[in-house]
From Swiss-Prot:
Site (Important in sugar transport): 140
GO cellular component entries: cell outer membrane; pore complex
GO molecular function: maltodextrin transmembrane transporter activity; maltose transporting porin activity
UniProt-annotated location(s): Cell outer membrane
Function statement: Involved in the transport of maltose and maltodextrins.
Subunit structure: Homotrimer formed of three 18-stranded antiparallel beta-barrels, containing three independent channels.
Protein source organism: Vibrio cholerae serotype O1 (strain ATCC 39541 / Classical Ogawa 395 / O395)
Site (Greasy slide, important in sugar transport) residue list: 32, 64, 96, 231, 378, 415
Protein name: Maltoporin
Induction record: By maltose.
Key words, A-Z: Cell outer membrane, Ion transport, Membrane, Porin, Signal, Sugar transport, Transmembrane, Transmembrane beta strand, Transport
Recorded topology in the membrane: Multi-pass membrane protein
Listed InterPro entries: G_neg_Bact_CarbUptk_Porin (IPR050286), Maltoporin (IPR023738), Porin_LamB (IPR003192), Porin_LamB_sf (IPR036998)
Amino acid sequence: MELTMKKVSVIAAAVAATLAAGSAFAVDFNGYFRAGTGISGNGNADQAVNKAGTGRLGNENDNYYEFGFAEELKTGEQTWKVESMIAQGNSGANGWEDGDFNVAQFNVQAKGLLASDQEAVMWAGKRYYQRKDIHITDFYFLNTSGTGGGIENLSVGNQKLSVALVQDGDNTNSSGYIFDARLANIGLWENASLELAMAYNFATEKDSKNEVADDGVLVSAILHQGLSNGFNQTVFQYGTAGYGAQAANFWGAGSYYARGTEAFNDASGFRLLNWGVINLGENWEMGHQLAYLAGSDIGGQFGGDGANKNTYTGKSFDIDQYSVVVRPMYKWNDTMRTVFEAGYNAGEKISNGGLATEDFGNAKFTVAQAWAMGDSFWARPELRVYGTYLLDTENDKAFGDDDTEFVVGIQVEAWW
């Protein structure tokens, strides 16, 4: 009995210590999710077409969740941040759906370790690493996230330098890595700054193995202009080899480098992006995306699920495309708004199992009645009821027996 009481006392003391620590260091609960459903005219439930090029409003047919927990622990002049996040996505077709939970983040970031630069941060673990995206299209144009480590926000004059090494895949022949270097806060004219980034993707070959894919480099220049009524950002990116193929498409840029194929060894590509959000009077706000993407000597790959999947066809192509997306929003009051979004994406893509190219064209028009916790363009949570009209300008059979489709749906989006 005495031994049992001692065990209970130890447990009680541990619980008390945990509660005391919680009162001193509050855990930060953060995250993002979207969920919704729609009914389409062809009877195939919800529909979504090329949201990176035509806009995401009323054009997402999935549920996606991110739940993160972080805590900052202070000791003297140092701050240690422990960060974690799980993520999961599914179609939302049933009330209970199986799916793997991904540990999207699990890392430690320590600030104040360098006496000469108290703002510099050393980190290691799995992390969303300084991702760059355009919200209205859900397009991450620079994303080298993964497991690794580095140091960021090193002071170089008035600029901030960050360097990192992140693993990027593993196959039977090699292991891939990204060396990421960035210089931010380069002052230009009034309210304007420049950030330069370089990602070098390389591989280490395993014993007696040969990696056929060449290493690639992606360079980015991001010009941010603050405005009295919002902001504008212009991005130029240039990539070689596997990064050349990424830059010529809306595939993201940074991770998931193509290894195990020589299809992109001679490739080069670039992107020119412009996006931003501005106020247009007391009741109107608008976001936009303008994009032009092009690539040279992009190799074709066999499709399907056979033994030749992703194998180089021996044919290479020059491709390009452009995208225009606008999202104006009218605010009726502090909660209710009507949101419009129109987008068009067209160009030339590799098709026919990597043996030819073809023209493509997608258009989307959405009207949504929405209610949000605040009147800002960025206010969330937001409930939406929407109608979306989809058009494929090059394929008469894109939606069953038609080149058009109409979707009515409801969605919630939140971040905190």
